[in-house]
Amino acid sequence: MKLCVAFLLVLVILPSVIGGKPSERTLSGATRRGDRRMCLSLGQRCERHSNCCGYLCCFYDKCVVTAIGCGHY
């Protein structure tokens, strides 16, 4: 348990120690810019592969699961 807490503490503190800057694509950054795009779930209407969540592809205007990936459509 103590090891887990120590590991999480290191992950939280490490970026500030090494001078890491927060990414532009953080949730707070996206909210500030009004960029509130959300991915679409299985069966929802889409226009392109990037509209669909994770492993889903846009095929015939719907987000679907494919066996061969999105690049083949």
Swiss-Prot record:
Cell location: Secreted
Disulfide bonds: C39-C53, C46-C58, C52-C63, C57-C70
GO cellular component assignments: extracellular region
Positions of the propeptide removed during maturation: 21-35
Main location: secreted
Keyword vocabulary terms for this entry: Cleavage on pair of basic residues, Disulfide bond, Ion channel impairing toxin, Neurotoxin, Secreted, Signal, Toxin
Tissue-by-tissue expression: Expressed by the venom duct.
Free-text note regarding domains: The cysteine framework is XI (C-C-CC-CC-C-C).
Family listed: Belongs to the conotoxin I1 superfamily.
Entry protein name: Conotoxin Bt11.1
